[in-house]
């Protein structure tokens, strides 16, 4: 369920704003989206894993707050990010 260091590095390189960026809101949202995707797959196979379901809801809330922050800062960057990640219909 957790991300490997190599996969995190791929996400950092794909979404970073500058070469040493690992903590911007865009990168954090991308990492959270990957974790949410993996956890959703786990929960489809393990329907009674309620602890993981709680963790999933926590991750979704965190991503929602970060996306609200990005929207408040720069609407164009927000639209580009959600389109690139394939979230929000």
From Swiss-Prot:
Pfam families: Ribosomal_S15. GO terms for biological process: translation. One of its GO terms (molecular function) is rRNA binding. CDD domains: Ribosomal_S15p_S13e (cd00353). InterPro entries: Ribosomal_uS15, Ribosomal_uS15_bac-type, uS15_NS1_RNA-bd_sf. Coiled coil: none annotated. GO terms for cellular component: cytosolic small ribosomal subunit. Keywords: Ribonucleoprotein, Ribosomal protein, RNA-binding, rRNA-binding. Gene3D superfamilies: 6.10.250.3130, S15/NS1, RNA-binding. One of the primary rRNA binding proteins, it binds directly to 16S rRNA where it helps nucleate assembly of the platform of the 30S subunit by binding and bridging several RNA helices of the 16S rRNA. Belongs to the universal ribosomal protein uS15 family. NCBIfam families: S15_bact. Part of the 30S ribosomal subunit. Forms a bridge to the 50S subunit in the 70S ribosome, contacting the 23S rRNA. This is Small ribosomal subunit protein uS15. It comes from Synechococcus elongatus (strain ATCC 33912 / PCC 7942 / FACHB-805) (Anacystis nidulans R2).
């Amino acid at each position: 369920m957790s991300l490997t260091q190599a996969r995190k590095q791929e996400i950092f390189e794909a979404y970073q704003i500058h070469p040493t960026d690992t903590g911007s809101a865009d990168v954090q949202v991308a990492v959270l989206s990957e974790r949410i995707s993996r956890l959703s797959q786990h929960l489809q196979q393990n329907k009674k894993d309620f602890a993981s379901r709680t963790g999933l809801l926590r991750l979704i809330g965190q991503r929602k707050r970060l996306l609200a922050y990005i929207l408040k800062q720069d609407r164009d960057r927000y639209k580009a990010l959600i389109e690139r990640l394939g979230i929000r219909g």
